[in-house]
């Protein structure tokens, strides 16, 4: 709001106050075990966009990093980051977390996240277009640079790699071919690297329906409920006119989550 009226200003101030009260309440819970109402112990991980977020992660005693959005490394600059630049960032994060899990999502550009120097063609429906793993598989030189940096950095901490927008076993097998090439290259070059766990994001109905088969190909799943809700309910989550219809607790979404969990544990 550029010039809010008194009512709007009052509502915003109330929201700000409520948010501050929530933060203060959460601070009183820091250091306690995370146990659900039905007695399940869970770990609370942080989401970050760059290494600058690490201070807050440590301050709030997170159990690890559940999602490092690596695309922000690309979005915050005007040229492609080099392998060495990425390696140093990933290594810093891994070493700072001192053995705690760090799950790094590979480049998830496209849709609502655009980067001019990628020179991507305009699309009528970007959310359904060339994004995430589709870009990585069609532009392998970008993908390989990132994967080399990730494998190198994994020698310095508990890094896992997560691939976004996977919809088929075929995509995973293409990724595995690229990973095998990278391992061979690094070995021949005498470069130290680790063996990070590799997982995928489940964020489309196709991935849900294929989750039993996909589980056989990877080490872990992460359910991306924002996109899964959008694609399941056929609702553009960027459209404010549809806010009332965007429901992550819709029975269809909850059933899909249940299906993924059951298939992952088979």
Feature map (PLM): residue ranges:
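Conserved alpha/beta-domain cores
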Residues: 24-266
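Conserved glycine-bearing catalytic or ligand-binding loops at nucleotide- and phosphate-handling centers
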Residues: 1-14
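Phosphate-binding P-loop/Walker A region and its immediate neighborhood
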Residues: 16-19
